[in-house]
């Protein structure tokens, strides 16, 4: 990162901010051995926010994992702007991950799309809001660990931030995304009986039973698509993510474990989803008398949505149109931290530069124009909250 880029970043240039952030590694250490974590990036962000006059705090939410929160007084409602500091790993990348090269109207590098461009848009808008003109009360919260377990957002939520509405600048191609699916993981363990491969009369094949169960999920998936469609998210889905079983080709396997993922819709209850998995298992058990299996719920994250007619959604659409962005409201397929803000009563939507298709890719990039437009829209939306009630 050269001195000119740093100087431009300090005065709030969105492109320079993006390049400075991409040039500062923040690989989640839970996802790649030797990952640097968020400490250096958090310190850089905190330095900028503090120099712009925000009341800024760095919090260690877990050993060597850091959140940054800056607050700026204004008038009227309180707007929370959020993004995550961490990135996925760099293994397998086909470009230098931290060069932040500009070429073809794009910035290239790990985290450029997911989501350091979004952080830069927040920072650029924040710098402008510190200057003349109306502004709401502002909370800038940049969190750790979204790519793994959302430790940073859970810590932020536990601190009970007092905000009226929130924007999470995940990559949405500058479409407003007020809804996204949740997910639930279930571990299915099938127990068989080990025996020599030449003795089918003695063995019970746990892998066969697991395969029958996974095959039965095809019908379950079709049932999900036959349910009434969500206007933005359409339908839930189900698939098997991992499978482990057996000890040798010549031995009937006595155990097989399958981890299943169900993508859920806003409002679906996890216990009801687990019951659906159990129903399928019970039906299979009736046909296969020697089947023995158990289900265990693992990780669950809720789906979420904000009404399309809310001031948050409509205000962002209006601010976008002021800057020549055609209005677009879409659903987000991935799960993001916005759901946890909605859970604590802060309406949150996703709106940011970049395309989720580029996130985590081997040659990750983001368009320069989208970064600049996003900063413009965030500033306009924030000011409109005060002058027009957005």
Task: Kindly give the residue locations of the regions a language model identified.
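Residue-level signal for inorganic ion chemistry
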Residues: 25, 49, 170, 210, ...
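Alpha-helical metal-binding/catalytic segments enriched in His/Glu/Asp
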Residues: 81, 101-147, 187-190, 201-221, ...
């Amino acid at each position: 990162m050269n001195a000119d880029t740093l100087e431009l970043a300090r005065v709030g240039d969105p492109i320079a901010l993006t390049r400075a952030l991409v040039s500062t590694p923040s690989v989640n250490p839970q996802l790649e051995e030797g990952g640097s974590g968020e400490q250096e990036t958090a310190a850089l962000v905190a330095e900028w926010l503090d120099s712009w006059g925000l009341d800024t705090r760095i919090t260690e939410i877990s050993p060597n994992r850091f959140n940054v929160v800056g607050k700026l007084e204004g008038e009227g409602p309180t707007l929370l702007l959020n993004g995550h500091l961490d990135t996925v790993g760099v293994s397998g990348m086909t470009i230098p991950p931290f060069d932040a090269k500009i070429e073809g109207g794009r910035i290239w590098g790990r985290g450029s799309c997911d989501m350091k461009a979004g952080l830069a848009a927040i920072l650029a808008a924040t710098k402008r809001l510190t200057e003349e003109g109306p502004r709401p009360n502002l909370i800038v919260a940049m969190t750790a660990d979204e790519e793994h377990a959302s430790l940073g957002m859970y810590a932020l939520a536990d601190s009970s931030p007092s905000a009226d509405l929130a924007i999470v600048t995940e990559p949405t191609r500058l479409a407003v995304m007020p809804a996204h699916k949740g997910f639930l993981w279930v571990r299915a363990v099938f127990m068989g009986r080990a025996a020599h491969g030449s003795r089918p009369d003695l063995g019970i094949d746990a892998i066969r039973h697991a395969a029958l169960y996974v095959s039965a999920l095809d019908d379950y998936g079709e049932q999900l698509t036959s349910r009434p469609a969500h206007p933005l998210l359409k339908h839930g889905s189900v698939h098997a993510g991992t499978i482990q079983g057996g000890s040798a080709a010549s031995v009937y396997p006595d155990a097989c474990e399958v981890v299943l993922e169900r993508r859920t819709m806003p409002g679906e209850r996890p216990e009801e989803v687990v019951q659906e998995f159990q129903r399928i298992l019970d039906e299979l058990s009736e046909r296969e008398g020697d089947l023995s299996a158990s289900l265990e719920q693992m990780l669950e994250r809720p789906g979420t949505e904000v009404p399309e007619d809310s001031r948050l959604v409509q205000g962002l659409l209006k601010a976008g149109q002021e800057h020549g962005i055609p209005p677009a409201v879409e659903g987000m397929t991935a799960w993001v931290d916005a759901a946890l803000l909605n859970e604590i009563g802060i309406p949150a939507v996703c709106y940011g530069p970049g395309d989720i298709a580029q996130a985590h890719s081997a040659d990750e990039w983001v368009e320069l124009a989208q970064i600049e437009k996003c900063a413009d829209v965030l500033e306009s939306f924030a000011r409109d909250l005060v002058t027009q009630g957005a």
